Amino acid sequence: MKTLLLTLVVVVTIVCLDLGYTLKCNQHIPPFYKTCAAGKNLCYKIFMVAAPKVPVKRGCIDVCPKSSDLVKYVCCNTDRCN
């Protein structure tokens, strides 16, 4: 019985703990974040070049797009770095 209980505790711990395999990215308002889906291993934020201090959008992405004359993309790969 003790072995079964110990096994259950270990399984619940593994399921509940984030073991570092997922990335967390800020949403539009930075205190709020979401866990990225599998394959989305970058966080990003988009700025309008005319107003570089105000991010337009934030989230998870798989490949960082190239910036243009109007929009600047900033990508990173650590938790809540955007």
Swiss-Prot record:
<dbReference type="Pfam" id="PF21947">
    <property type="entry name" value="Toxin_cobra-type"/>
</dbReference>
<feature type="signal peptide">
    <location>
        <begin position="1"/>
        <end position="22"/>
    </location>
</feature>
<comment type="similarity">
    <text>Belongs to the three-finger toxin family. Short-chain subfamily. Type IA cytotoxin sub-subfamily.</text>
</comment>
<dbReference type="InterPro" id="IPR003572">
    <property type="entry name" value="Cytotoxin_Cobra"/>
</dbReference>
<keyword id="KW-0964">Secreted</keyword>
<keyword id="KW-0732">Signal</keyword>
<dbReference type="GO" id="GO:0044218">
    <property type="term" value="C:other organism cell membrane"/>
</dbReference>
<protein>
    <recommendedName>
        <fullName>Cytotoxin 10</fullName>
    </recommendedName>
</protein>
<dbReference type="InterPro" id="IPR045860">
    <property type="entry name" value="Snake_toxin-like_sf"/>
</dbReference>
<dbReference type="InterPro" id="IPR003571">
    <property type="entry name" value="Snake_3FTx"/>
</dbReference>
<keyword id="KW-1053">Target membrane</keyword>
<keyword id="KW-1052">Target cell membrane</keyword>
<dbReference type="InterPro" id="IPR018354">
    <property type="entry name" value="Snake_toxin_con_site"/>
</dbReference>
<feature type="disulfide bond">
    <location>
        <begin position="64"/>
        <end position="75"/>
    </location>
</feature>
<feature type="disulfide bond">
    <location>
        <begin position="36"/>
        <end position="60"/>
    </location>
</feature>
<dbReference type="GO" id="GO:0005576">
    <property type="term" value="C:extracellular region"/>
</dbReference>
<dbReference type="GO" id="GO:0031640">
    <property type="term" value="P:killing of cells of another organism"/>
</dbReference>
<keyword id="KW-0800">Toxin</keyword>
<keyword id="KW-0204">Cytolysis</keyword>
<dbReference type="InterPro" id="IPR054131">
    <property type="entry name" value="Toxin_cobra-type"/>
</dbReference>
<keyword id="KW-0123">Cardiotoxin</keyword>
<feature type="disulfide bond">
    <location>
        <begin position="76"/>
        <end position="81"/>
    </location>
</feature>
<dbReference type="GO" id="GO:0016020">
    <property type="term" value="C:membrane"/>
</dbReference>
<keyword id="KW-1015">Disulfide bond</keyword>
<dbReference type="GO" id="GO:0090729">
    <property type="term" value="F:toxin activity"/>
</dbReference>
<keyword id="KW-0472">Membrane</keyword>
<comment type="subunit">
    <text>Monomer in solution; Homodimer and oligomer in the presence of negatively charged lipids forming a pore with a size ranging between 20 and 30 Angstroms.</text>
</comment>
<feature type="disulfide bond">
    <location>
        <begin position="25"/>
        <end position="43"/>
    </location>
</feature>
<comment type="function">
    <text>Shows cytolytic activity on many different cells by forming pore in lipid membranes. In vivo, increases heart rate or kills the animal by cardiac arrest. In addition, it binds to heparin with high affinity, interacts with Kv channel-interacting protein 1 (KCNIP1) in a calcium-independent manner, and binds to integrin alpha-V/beta-3 (ITGAV/ITGB3) with moderate affinity.</text>
</comment>
